[in-house]
Amino acid sequence: MESESESGAAADTPPLETLSFHGDEEIIEVVELDPGPPDPDDLAQEMEDVDFEEEEEEEGNEEGWVLEPQEGVVGSMEGPDDSEVTFALHSASVFCVSLDPKTNTLAVTGGEDDKAFVWRLSDGELLFECAGHKDSVTCAGFSHDSTLVATGDMSGLLKVWQVDTKEEVWSFEAGDLEWMEWHPRAPVLLAGTADGNTWMWKVPNGDCKTFQGPNCPATCGRVLPDGKRAVVGYEDGTIRIWDLKQGSPIHVLKGTEGHQGPLTCVAANQDGSLILTGSVDCQAKLVSATTGKVVGVFRPETVASQPSLGEGEESESNSVESLGFCSVMPLAAVGYLDGTLAIYDLATQTLRHQCQHQSGIVQLLWEAGTAVVYTCSLDGIVRLWDARTGRLLTDYRGHTAEILDFALSKDASLVVTTSGDHKAKVFCVQRPDR
């Protein structure tokens, strides 16, 4: 099956009020860039100094890991399949995937079957099951040094496992889980819950700190690259930038500064000076992490809007599903539920390209050190786009249902996907331009 024709808008497309500014601010002048990344040892030491509250130890689930038979690994499937390895031990939709950051040789996946597995990318061999969850596993990830792996289910049960020993070392029950992320430099786990709290734990001793938001779910969050702050988005449209050591908000954006609907995603640029936030209100806001001011608002192009409807008809919903910054050019990408991938030029404050998919975008990721952006969508296809030209470089197929999550190896040689077809797949990325 040949890929459908998908085009990007020409670079000379005039700006169609895709970006609005507050007052006389300009992006380049508002933001003061940090001199460079902090020393990892200093960050780890700072996290040691954080005043955590002592939590009462709860009885953990003592179930051990279970070794599954190798027949769960599938080499190929009927129909076009570009993948090298298919992991097939899940018995329901696979919601999440993460790669170990140190070696990029292991994956952890979690699914609707209440299971999470750690397995090897090269051949799909199961290393161990993260047993004991009683609800869909929606979050999973490795610590910064790949020694620990955390899994979280919808009910709020979080578990952490020592990778080399395959043993559970920590467990905690929070409220209904919205998101989870490891600290970039220390064995510290953060999570947002439906009661509006953001939690931070030292692992494995369990020392805990909470950051209380508004009385609504903390729908998305991200630790900033300096490791000292986190940005959290909430269901009521507010955005908070937290000081992790002090436990207090540095900036709060609400009302017209915030969003007019629940936040769906947040991202930060490489030095943490700029933040992008996305919402079901179809807007992506560019925020200075230093001043807490909104310096730009990106809105969907008119091409993506729905035609006028007759009486009694409802318009199709659209929302920002994923976004991110390019690491080598002043570009940002925003992916929408209606299938639009918009590439914005931050230097000229204009829409650079608009790339249309046949179905909704689920997630996008920028390749490190290049201007290539990857998208996965509800049609089960991974696509690679050149953000400089808006051109589709290639695509990868093999799933028989929507892709729900994907991860990219550091050297961009592997893409690992999870899907509603109960499978996780490993694709080898081959590009003649590198």
Swiss-Prot record:
Keywords: Angiogenesis, Cell membrane, Cytoplasm, Developmental protein, Differentiation, Membrane, Phosphoprotein, Repeat, WD repeat. It comes from the Eukaryota. Expressed in metastatic melanoma, liver, skin, kidney, heart, lung, lymph node, skeletal muscle and brain, and also in A2058 melanoma cells and activated T-cells (at protein level). Expressed in blood vessels. Strongly expressed in endothelial cells, cytotrophoblasts, and poorly differentiated. colon adenocarcinoma cells found in lymphatics. Residues 39-62 have a biased composition (Acidic residues). The modification Phosphoserine is found at residue 20. GO terms for biological process: angiogenesis; cell differentiation; positive regulation of endothelial cell migration; smooth muscle cell migration. WD repeats lie at residues 89-129, 132-171, 173-212, 214-254, 258-299, 315-354, 356-395, 398-433. Residues 1-63 are annotated as: Disordered. Gene3D superfamilies: YVTN repeat-like/Quinoprotein amine dehydrogenase. It is found in: Cell membrane; Cytoplasm. Plays a role in angiogenesis and cell migration. In smooth muscle cell migration, may act through the RhoA pathway. This is Angio-associated migratory cell protein. It comes from Homo sapiens. The lineage of its organism: Eukaryota, Metazoa, Chordata, Craniata, Vertebrata.
